[in-house]
Each structure stands twice: as C-alpha cells, then as structure tokens.
C-alpha cells in the first residue's frame, strides 16, 4: 500500500499525529472525521484517569482490550448523534422474510453526520523498543476484525434507520510500551519516528492479512504527555489508532 502522509494536530494539551486524507468520497471524509474526533476524545477521557494526588493511575490503554470499552463508548457518545449502542445484533430489520443472522453482534452502533456506523474494535500492545513485526497479536487480531466486518456486509443492507448508508468501521488501538524505563531522549526518538512506525505497521497489516479488504485507511498516534509516559518500571509513549473504513452500503428498500 502507498505510505500515509501525516501532520500534527494539537488541542487542549493533546497532541496527535494523524494521516492526511485526500478523497472525493463523502463516506470516507465522514469516516475520517469520526476517527479524528474519536482519538481526541479518547485521549481527553484517558487523561482524566491520571490522578497522582489520589494515587490513581488506572489508564485504560495499559490494560486488556475490554478495558478500552470504558473509554471508547463515552467517547463515541460525546461525538455521535444520539445514543451509542454496544453489542448490537447485526440484523434488526423487521420483514415478512425473517432472516436469521449467523454473524452475532457488532461492538458499536451509532449515527454520525447522517451515516450509520457499525464498528468492531480490537486492542493490542506493541513493544516500541523491538524491531520485530507484530505478527502474532496485532496482525492476527486485525485480520479477525476485518473478517467480522466482511461477514456483516449483507446484514448492513437490512438496517432500517433512514440514513445515507452504513459504514463498516474497524478500530485497532495499539498501545506502545516497553517493560523498561527509557530516557527522555528515547521517548523523543519514538515521537520523531512515529510516522515511519505507523507506515511500517500498516504495510505489514496490508501485506500479511489474508482477509479481503485488509489494508488500513487511517493511522494516527496520540503522543502521551511527558507526565504520563512512565508508570512504575514501564514506558508508555503513545497510543496508535489504525482503522479501516469500508465503502458505505446503501439500505435496501423495505419489502413489507
């Protein structure tokens, strides 16, 4: 895949390095906007968990994938139109021809800028001090996420809300970390090299993922503030968000 170009966005003490979009497709621009705003809100809410005076350092990106939900759900709620539903059945269409879904549920359902979004989320940790590609965890989970979104494509046509279409969106949060305490110089090297690191990861996902449509369409990193980088004997310099937005699916007319 072609490498992304990046630029820095800063707001309210939050610094994000994000890929730049150049698309004439409305759905892609809307997907980019929700991702961009989501990562800012993710960072804002994560920073609220940093309370040194109360000895509270329960930063969600330090833990497992399920802990991310405690930040992603309210972040989506803050930026989307109306309610964000979690663990939503893929098929909700009421029809004379009852269709039984074998695909289960999607992690999130929401409406943003006139589009329905069905979202799958994964989370991984990646040691930024290692040169090896993240074959087992990151690539395997990315491939599973793309597979799940491919499986619900036909079901998305049957969603009954009156929107411009349904955008399937895959979110993969990658927490950069090391079980070592590095110097500030090494953290700065991470920040300076994050563009290259993101492109290497995205290229690996596009190349190694055997599932159709596996190439990422968005990549960004939240550069964690200096005061939050170190925790006990570990270093957390950033949280990456790598995402895939599929072309919007138009609703089928009701057959009722």
Where are these regions (language model features)?
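Conserved catalytic cores of phosphodiester-cleaving nucleases, focusing on short active-site segments
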Residues: 108-129
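Acidic-residue sensor for enzyme active/binding pockets
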Residues: 65, 87, 120
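Glycine-rich, aromatic-bearing surface loops/beta-hairpins
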Residues: 161-256
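Interdomain/boundary linker segments immediately adjacent to catalytic/signaling cores
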Residues: 1-79
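Catalytic cores of nucleic-acid endonucleases
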Residues: 123-189
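Short, charged, solvent-exposed linker or helix-capping segments at domain edges/interfaces
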Residues: 120, 130-132, 252-256
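A short acidic/basic microdomain associated with nuclease active sites
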Residues: 76-102, 107-111
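Well-ordered, non-membrane alpha-helical segments in soluble/globular domains
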Residues: 31-44, 135-156, 187-208
